[in-house]
């Protein structure tokens, strides 16, 4: 924890997420992609309390269907009960219920906050995201679950998000993409907890089934939908320097084998190419030489929005913990008043975290990073 205090300083003011940047902005420092303390803070501030896009109702279409998921060490189950309701539970001894939201397109979101009402409402970050006009071209009820696949790699989950949300590398790294979209017209729209990706498409590309709508859902999920298929991608953190890229693939009920295989295999190639880009990026960060660079306000607008949101959320949570004098884990169920007293040393041992009295490094490190980020 000493890293945290050195980074943040005694108290910090979380910078607002900028809607429009005119000058380059300082990126997150390399230590945020390697530090165990920062990873634990992200587990508390992000994955314990924010809404996580997880799956689609077609994944559990029948009563009794269930699937286990994980997010930064939190394991939970999504199921359909005998009454046809979609529910979720922590995969622990108590099977504590998890908050669920199903949007108008059938996507299932979970919030691991153990409070009766989550601190963060779904509409706080995603109001209207399921009503994008471009979704009018698709009927999500006409798709069926087809298969899953995944890739594990030695990279921080944020590297995956940074890579996904810009495309100036696409022309060189992804030879398939120019066949389905005009990279010269690529741009993103950012709002609250989502990043919408756009690129003009020729009529022949649309006729071949490549009318594609792509959205990134902060913190760690995305969806690409086309007339023949859609796939969901989740960047699942395992440690500060290891993540799993998990995919759920859905097929339109009228898609031919040829049309479905064409686009499904293409995206598998693209995602595999991204994996190796991210592995090499993490290696550079692990070397300990690079500190942080600048983000271009236009070409890297997606990563800029993603990183600004990370910086804001973790800083606010750290300040809340400072005021409380202890770590705050929203996903942990409150202790019953009838339960035996908990030994504080036992809690510290289980979490593997140092006490706040030793948490100097992260606070100072954050403070030193936030100042230039705000100034620029």
Task: Please annotate each region the language model reported.
Residues 3-4, 60, 77-82, 99-376:
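C-terminal catalytic domain of Rieske-type non-heme iron oxygenases
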Residues 2-90, 100-101:
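N-terminal pre-ligand scaffold of iron-sulfur
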């Amino acid at each position: 924890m000493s890293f945290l205090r050195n980074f943040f300083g005694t108290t910090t003011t979380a910078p607002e997420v900028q809607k429009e940047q005119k000058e380059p902005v300082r990126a997150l420092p390399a230590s945020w992609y390697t530090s165990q303390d920062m990873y634990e803070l992200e587990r508390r501030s992000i994955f314990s309390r924010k809404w996580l896009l997880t799956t689609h109702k077609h994944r559990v279409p029948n009563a009794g269907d269930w699937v286990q998921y994980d997010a930064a060490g939190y394991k939970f189950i999504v199921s359909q009960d005998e009454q046809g309701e979609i529910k979720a539970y922590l995969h622990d001894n108590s099977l504590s219920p998890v908050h669920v939201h199903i949007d108008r397109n059938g996507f299932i979101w979970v919030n691991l906050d153990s409070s009766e009402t989550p601190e963060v409402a779904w509409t706080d970050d995603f109001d209207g995201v399921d009503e994008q006009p471009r979704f009018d071209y698709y009927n999500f009820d006409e798709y069926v679950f087809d298969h899953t696949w995944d890739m594990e790699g030695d990279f921080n989950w944020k590297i995956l998000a940074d890579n996904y949300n810009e495309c100036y590398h696409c022309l060189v790294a992804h030879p398939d993409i120019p066949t389905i979209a005009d990279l010269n017209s690529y741009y993103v729209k950012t709002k609250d907890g989502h990043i919408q990706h756009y690129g003009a498409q020729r009529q022949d590309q649309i006729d071949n089934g490549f009318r594609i709508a792509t959205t990134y859902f902060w913190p760690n999920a995305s969806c690409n939908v086309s007339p023949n298929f859609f796939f969901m991608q989740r960047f699942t953190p395992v440690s500060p320097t290891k993540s799993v890229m998990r995919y759920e693939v859905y097929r339109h009920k009228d898609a031919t084998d040829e049309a479905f295989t064409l686009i499904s295999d293409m995206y598998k190639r693209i995602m595999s190419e991204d994996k190796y880009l991210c592995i090499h990026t993490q290696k550079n960060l692990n070397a300990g030489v690079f500190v942080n660079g600048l983000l271009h306000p236009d070409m890297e607008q997606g990563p800029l929005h993603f990183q600004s949101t990370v910086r804001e959320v973790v800083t606010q949570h750290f300040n809340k913990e400072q005021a409380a004098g202890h770590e705050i884990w929203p996903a942990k169920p409150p202790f019953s008043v009838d339960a035996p007293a908990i030994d504080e040393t036992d809690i510290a041992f289980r979490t593997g975290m140092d006490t706040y009295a030793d948490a100097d490094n992260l606070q100072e490190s954050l403070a030193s990073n936030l100042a230039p980020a705000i100034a620029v």
